[in-house]
């Protein structure tokens, strides 16, 4: 992996708790990323931080390192009860909460601090059983946390650290009232360490967030470069009739190792999945109504390489740490210009190079001016030869719900086309 995204600043240069240093070095973390190097001097001195950095720059480890150091360096409140966690990390989605929990486990193993996880969808009793034994760091989504708090399974009166991750999405999804409800049940802002991290922070979000922070320091990485320097951006203008064939031709030509294809609706994602599955690709489907256990399984298959292509709505665009994604396709240009940044941020992570390809079709081309205004540059336009598009394509598979026995499963196809089936003659014109 490329190290060019790291700074000369080492974690060991900071006055971090020795167990935190041990946990970081055990996982191979020695040098800080820019956002970590900027944030840690403040958080380690007890100052609140609002951090903005593009996706994949180490925001999660910045706040986890700060959280564990703070808890190890400060005693628990006197009289703390079993149902009172010491730190609360709020995430907008179940998938992100699960990922943060996984990233925190190495720190927990070394330090002995206990983790809890609380998210909706399933696992209610399993999550509750862990909480009943007492946890130090509770990671979760607002709805399930409020549920537990109202039933007194969780009491927030001993919170010493609170983190809002992907804060802009928290507010965009309408969680403002939930967040305020939770904050009202914590100690005052000046009695805890507060951190807020996100790839994009609007003025509205900062104002709302700062209501619950204590004179926070604002730190940012590359504020004028909203898309990563290592991401090659490319744009095509297909007709609606040629759009699917262009996508399949580009996949055939690029033959990417690990790809995410974004579309704007569940039904469009299902259509793309059906065409690619029928064409022999190992493809997974991730939309909002996929059951939680299946979502986690699909993400695990994609991460392990058992699935090569993930077709997704924006549910997968925020916060998921999927390594080595080589390509992102915007089959539809997003309606929200900020989602463009989050989508293509799935590639080019941790110093690697990435490739983003967007299709500006007749339906969504009107979204392009707002996107280019937001990212501060025009996306390079490429041309293609209609006569060179693939034509020998099978009819798409149709998604069968509530199906048992044989047949295509929702969310996956296990047969990747062999390299021998690729056509060497299908090329796009420059």
Swiss-Prot record:
Its main location: cytoplasm. Residues 388-430 are annotated as: Disordered. The keyword Nuclease does not apply. Transmembrane segments: none annotated. InterPro entries: DEAD/DEAH_box_helicase_dom (IPR011545), DEAD_box_RNA_helicase (IPR050079), Helicase_ATP-bd (IPR014001), Helicase_C-like (IPR001650), P-loop_NTPase (IPR027417), RNA-helicase_DEAD-box_CS (IPR000629), RNA_helicase_ATP-dep_RhlB (IPR023554), RNA_helicase_DEAD_Q_motif (IPR014014). One of its GO terms (cellular component) is cytosol. Its EC number is 3.6.4.13. ATP binds at residues 53-60. The keyword Hydrolase applies. Residues 402-423 have a biased composition (Low complexity). Pfam families: DEAD (PF00270), Helicase_C (PF00271). A motif (Q motif) lies at residues 9-37. The gene is rhlB. Component of the RNA degradosome, which is a multiprotein complex involved in RNA processing and mRNA degradation. Keywords: ATP-binding, Cytoplasm, Helicase, Hydrolase, Nucleotide-binding, RNA-binding. It is found in: Cytoplasm. A motif (DEAD box) lies at residues 165-168. DEAD-box RNA helicase involved in RNA degradation. Has RNA-dependent ATPase activity and unwinds double-stranded RNA. It catalyses: ATP + H2O = ADP + phosphate + H(+). GO terms for biological process: RNA catabolic process. Residues 245-390 form the Helicase C-terminal domain. It comes from the Bacteria. Belongs to the DEAD box helicase family. RhlB subfamily. One of its GO terms (molecular function) is ATP hydrolysis activity. Residues 40-219 form the Helicase ATP-binding domain. Gene3D superfamilies: P-loop containing nucleotide triphosphate hydrolases (3.40.50.300). This is ATP-dependent RNA helicase RhlB.
């Amino acid at each position: 992996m490329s190290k060019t995204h790291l700074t000369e600043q080492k974690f060991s240069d900071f006055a971090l708790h020795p167990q935190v240093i041990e946990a970081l070095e055990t996982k191979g973390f020695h040098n800080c990323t820019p956002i970590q190097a900027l944030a840690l001097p403040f958080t380690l001195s007890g100052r609140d931080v609002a951090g903005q950095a593009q996706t994949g720059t180490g925001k999660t480890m910045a706040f986890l390192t700060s959280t564990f150091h703070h808890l190890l360096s400060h005693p628990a409140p006197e009289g703390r009860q079993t149902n009172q966690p010491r730190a609360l990390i709020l995430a907008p989605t179940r998938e992100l909460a699960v990922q943060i929990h996984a990233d925190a486990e190495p720190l927990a193993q070394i330090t002995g601090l206990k983790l809890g996880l609380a998210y909706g969808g399933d696992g209610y009793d399993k999550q509750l059983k862990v909480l009943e034994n007492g946890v130090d760091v509770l990671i979760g989504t607002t709805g399930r946390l409020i549920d537990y708090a109202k039933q007194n399974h969780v009491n927030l009166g001993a919170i010493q650290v609170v983190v809002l991750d992907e804060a802009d999405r928290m507010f965009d999804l309408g969680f403002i009232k939930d967040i305020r409800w939770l904050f009202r049940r914590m100690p005052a802002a000046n009695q805890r360490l507060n951190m807020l991290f996100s790839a994009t922070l609007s003025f509205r979000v900062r104002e709302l967030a700062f209501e619950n922070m204590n004179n926070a320091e604002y730190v940012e990485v590359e504020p004028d470069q909203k898309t990563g320097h290592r991401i090659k951006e490319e744009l095509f203008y297909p007709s609606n009739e040629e759009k699917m064939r262009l996508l399949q031709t580009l996949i055939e030509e690029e033959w990417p190792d690990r790809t995410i294809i974004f579309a704007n609706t569940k039904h469009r994602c299902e259509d793309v999945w059906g065409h690619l599955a029928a064409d022999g690709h190992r493809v997974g489907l991730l939309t909002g109504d996929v059951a939680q256990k299946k979502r986690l399984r699909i993400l695990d298959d994609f991460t392990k390489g058992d699935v090569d292509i993930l077709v997704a709505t924006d549910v997968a665009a925020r916060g998921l740490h999927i390594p080595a994604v080589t390509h992102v396709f915007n089959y539809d240009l997003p309606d929200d210009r900020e989602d463009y940044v989050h989508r293509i941020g799935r590639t080019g992570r941790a110093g690697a190079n990435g490739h983003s390809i967007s299709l500006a079709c007749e339906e969504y081309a009107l979204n392009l001016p707002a996107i280019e205004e937001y990212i501060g540059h025009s996306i390079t336009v490429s041309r293609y030869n209609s006569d060179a598009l693939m034509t020998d394509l099978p009819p798409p598979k149709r998604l069968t719900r509530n199906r048992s026995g044989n047949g295509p499963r929702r969310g996956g196809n296990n047969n990747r086309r062999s390299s021998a089936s690729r056509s060497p003659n299908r090329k796009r014109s420059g």
